[in-house]
UniProtKB/Swiss-Prot annotation:
Biased composition (Basic and acidic residues): 622-635
Annotated CDD domains: Calpain_III, CysPc, EFh_PEF_CAPN3
A GO MF label: peptidase activity
Residues engaged in binding Ca(2+) 1: 662, 665, 667, 672
Domain EF-hand per the UniProt entry, residue ranges: 649-683, 692-725, 722-757, 787-821
Taxonomic source organism: Mus musculus
Name the record gives this protein: Calpain-3
UniProt keyword Cytoplasm, yes or no: yes
InterPro entries referenced in this protein's UniProt entry, alphabetically: C2_III, Calpain_cysteine_protease, Calpain_domain_III, Calpain_III, Calpain_III_sf, CAPN3/13-like_C_EFh, CAPN3_PEF, EF-hand-dom_pair
GO terms under biological process: calcium-dependent self proteolysis; cellular response to calcium ion; cellular response to salt stress; G1 to G0 transition involved in cell differentiation; muscle structure development; myofibril assembly; negative regulation of apoptotic process; negative regulation of DNA-templated transcription
Annotated PANTHER family: CALPAIN (PTHR10183), CALPAIN-3 (PTHR10183:SF329)
Binding-site list for Ca(2+) 4: 800, 802, 804, 806
Length: 821
């Protein structure tokens, strides 16, 4: 089960949130053959340049099936092949599974027999009861079911060994295409199977979901809410039943009426997700136990046709016991589906009932209202018929609501709209979706317990513009729901990834800062308490909660509990009225705009070099600046009294040193620049630097070169040196422990102090490019970063002929600009 952490933070102010409700049914999304997605938009320009070259455009299900039918071949999925790489990633097994297509397993295979229903799902030995419990819930809503399982496929008409299923994936609907090869042992399906031996929709759906996550093993252990959301695009609410509201039964009934999906479980005290095995049971032992079960089953069935008949029920095998079975028939640490709620008349009194289903297909509750309960004889025949009572071992059973509350500890509801289940009124909700990323060393700041880095987390401005329409509520309040979901952690399990412990906090933005979209700084969070926050930090894929706050502008700060944890997420905000949710981003700019010469053709290395000729003008202005730091934009720097003579003497000394190194041509190359800089820098022992590398000096020359000569003259070098001196002061300011490095989280402030204003994406890129493995930046890297920023801003301005912030380059210009940098 998930681990819950309640961090020690400033207490929340404002009203307690109501329990969240359900999500609008998403529109038709994009179709892709692959189970995975494309790189997110955050770094798409960078990632796409390194993305594998794709020879052909991705084909849709229809195109692939048509091609197979034309060639009269059965489809074989190259992305999820029928071999052990699609099964397990943690180890190889001596047991040999045989991949078979349904026509090879039985006669007359059918995709769906008599409609897809919850009895078609019998768990194999994978430990994915959480997934199967969600499927059982899905079968109760035919509209949702056939959104996930398209109608256009069968084993008869246009059969080509290819099937497809659709899942909601982080804001989009994706079409997952698979072949119909399934793993078998002794001609039995290894994993999920139907109650009918020749029905295969549930097994193929499980395979498509396994492909979406990279392997079957990736499905071992989870929370029902994950699959529920992937089937619907909904938002889940999570109840600890012992702390549930007094009208919980009413909430559950409305959830059933509105088509919401529900699952429940009994905590086993091990903090494991549903279906995970104890630490002492590895995958090899798990498979060995499974095979013994199947062998025993075969001994019982040895006299029957090994291919199986059309109508013989498949042999159901109780999975290896990761979970703990109780005397009452319930199983701890196991996911159940909630499939119905009713009130029955018994001995003159109404009794509230809950219908549950065990995805094993057997092992049921044996107490009051169970299938074999002795007091069914006192229940009216019509009541029995209404409750569809029958004594069958199908995993489904009734129990009283009182027994349900007594035994079960957790309830999960996946809502299909964002309407509160306590309300009888349905509203249309406004939805906004933001994608984000925590980058170690830059924007992975951890929770509020880590004040030095918390402020660096991604920030999202939320403008609540209109109050709710509720005549019975005198408060001026806006209702909204926040859902934070981490991405791809299950798919990346094979790389060692696990779910992070996540949560979020909500702060009100001061009125004077409304509308400016600036990233709020450390001091703001040190002296302002949150207005609301997630109830807990928890290691689940999604954390969601409903809030009620007055109209205003707020900032939502999503974070992991611990800092330095890197991952991607989406943040969804649902509100009853109009709202605006967007990432807080600074405008990209530099404090000292550079004059641009216009209408001159761009030749070779530089119009950038031409723009660098402006360095002399900037130098004269800078020499009159106060040592405290960069001037504000638009202010004219004034020379300090008595500064000219002192500067002239320094310039003369500088010229003499430069002439000694440069020679008669008064220009230096990269090697000579390295010697000059390191001679001076080595005198500053407090910098604790080993000096500049040759590659760093080459970059400095390329980015400061005004004539495209590949060398620096005195004026160019003087300007560079002035910059380095100014940046050195900034570096020392942030090197608080005198280690010769600064923490990468402080780089955002250092860059701002130097006059460069960037957005979060660029700060993340700087960290990835210049920080070491300990997330520290040394003096050499620090200066190289600033030189590059200075040079690239100047280069952009050189190419921005119209001053509109947009440049257009041909391939020659692009290569010249990037290669000589």
């Amino acid at each position: 089960m998930p681990t819950v952490i309640s961090p020690t933070v400033a207490p929340r102010t404002g009203a307690e949130p109501r329990s969240p409700g359900p999500v609008p049914h998403p529109a038709q999304g994009k179709t892709t053959e692959a189970g995975g997605g494309h790189p997110s938009g955050i770094y798409s320009a960078i990632i796409s340049r390194n993305f594998p070259i794709i020879g052909v455009k991705e084909k849709t299900f229809e195109q692939l099936r048509r091609k197979c039918l034309e060639k009269k071949v059965l489809y074989l999925d190259p992305e999820f092949p029928p071999d052990e790489t699609s099964l397990f990633y943690s180890q190889k097994f001596p047991i040999q599974f045989v991949w078979k297509r349904p026509p090879e397993i039985c006669e007359n295979p059918r995709f769906i027999i008599g409609g897809a229903n919850r009895t078609d799902i019998c768990q194999g030995d994978l430990g994915d009861c959480w997934f199967l419990a969600a499927i059982a819930c899905l079968t109760l809503n035919e509209r949702l079911l056939f959104r996930v399982i398209p109608h256009d496929q069968s084993f008869t008409e246009n059969y080509a060994g290819i099937f497809h299923f659709q899942f909601w994936r982080y804001g989009d609907w994706v079409d997952v295409v698979i072949d119909d090869c399934l793993p078998t042992y002794n001609n039995q399906l290894v994993f999920t199977k139907s109650n009918h031996r020749n029905e295969f929709w549930s097994a193929l759906l499980e395979k498509a979901y396994a492909k979406l996550h990279g392997s079957y093993e990736a499905l071992k252990g989870g929370n029902t809410t994950e699959a529920m959301e992937d089937f619907t695009g909904g938002v889940t609410e999570f109840f600890e039943i012992k702390d549930a509201p007094s009208d919980m039964y009413k909430i559950m009934r409305k959830a059933i009426e509105r088509g919401s999906l529900m699952g429940c479980s009994i905590d086993d005290g091990t903090n494991m997700t549903y279906g995970t095995s104890p630490s002492g049971l590895n995958m090899g032992e798990l498979i060995a136990r499974m095979v013994r079960n199947m062998d025993n089953s075969l001994l019982r069935d040895s006299d029957l046709d090994p291919r199986g008949s059309d109508d013989r029920p498949s042999r159901t095998i109780v999975p290896v016991q990761y979970e703990t079975r109780m005397a009452c028939g319930l199983v701890k640490g196991h996911a159940y589906s909630v499939t119905g709620l009713e009130e029955a008349l018994f001995k003159g009194e109404k009794v509230k009932l809950v219908r549950l289903r065990n995805p094993w297909g057997q092992v049921e509750w044996n107490g009051s209202w169970s299938d074999g309960w002795k007091d069914w004889s006192f229940v009216d025949k019509d009541e029995k018929a209404r409750l569809q009572h029958q004594v069958t071992e199908d995993g489904e059973f009734w129990m009283s609501y009182d027994d349900f509350v007594y035994h079960f500890t957790k309830l999960e509801i996946c809502n299909l709209t964002a309407d509160a289940l306590e309300s009888d009124k349905l509203q249309t909700w406004t939805v906004s979706v933001n994608e984000g990323r925590w980058v170690r060393g830059c924007s992975a700041g951890g929770c509020r317990n880590f004040p030095d880095t918390f402020w660096t987390n991604p920030q999202y401005r939320l403008k609540l513009l209109e109050e709710d329409d509720d005549p019975e509520d005198s408060e001026v309040i806006c209702s909204f729901l926040v859902a934070l979901m981490q991405k791809n952690r299950r798919k990346d399990r094979k790389l060692g990834a696990n779910l992070f412990t996540i949560g979020f906090a909500i702060y009100e933005v001061p009125k004077e800062m409304h509308g400016n979209k600036q990233h709020l700084q450390k001091d703001f969070f040190l002296y302002n308490a949150s207005k609301a926050r997630s109830k807990t930090y928890i290691n689940m894929r999604e954390v969601s909660q409903r809030f009620r706050l007055p109209p205003s502008e707020y900032v939502i700060v999503p974070s992991t509990y611990e800092p330095h944890q890197e991952g991607e997420f989406i943040l969804r905000v649902f509100s009853e009225k109009r709202n605006l949710s967007e990432e807080a981003e600074n405008t990209i700019s530099v404090d000292r705009p550079v004059k641009k010469k216009k209408n001159k053709p761009i030749i070779f290395v530089s119009d950038r070099a031409n723009s660098n000729k402006e360095l002399g003008v900037d130098q004269e202005a800078e020499e009159g600046k106060d040592k405290a730091g960069p001037e504000k934009r638009g202010e004219t720097p004034q020379p300090r009294p008595g500064h000219t003579d002192q500067e002239s003497e320094e310039q003369q000394q500088f010229r003499n040193i430069f002439r000694q190194i440069a020679g008669d041509d008064m220009e230096i190359c990269a090697d000579e620049l390295k010697n000059v800089l390191n001679t001076v820098v080595n005198k500053h022992k407090d910098l604790k630097t080993q000096g500049f590398t040759l590659e760093s000096c080459r970059s400095m020359i390329a980015l400061m070169d005004t004539d495209g000569s590949g060398r620096l003259n005195l004026q160019e070098f003087h300007h560079l040196w002035k910059k380095i001196k100014a940046w050195q002061k900034i570096f020392k300011h942030y090197d608080t422990d005198h280690s010769g490095t600064i923490n990468s989280y402080e780089m955002r402030n250092a860059v701002n102090d130097a006059g460069f204003h960037l957005n979060s994406q660029l700060y993340d890129i700087i960290t990835m490019r210049y920080a070491d493995k300990h997330m520290n930046i040394d003096f050499d890297s620090f200066i190289c970063c600033f030189v590059r920023l200075e040079g690239m801003f100047r280069a952009f301005n050189a190419f921005d002929k119209d001053g509109d912030g947009i440049i257009k380059l041909n391939v020659l210009e692009w290569l010249q600009l990037t290669m000589y940098a």
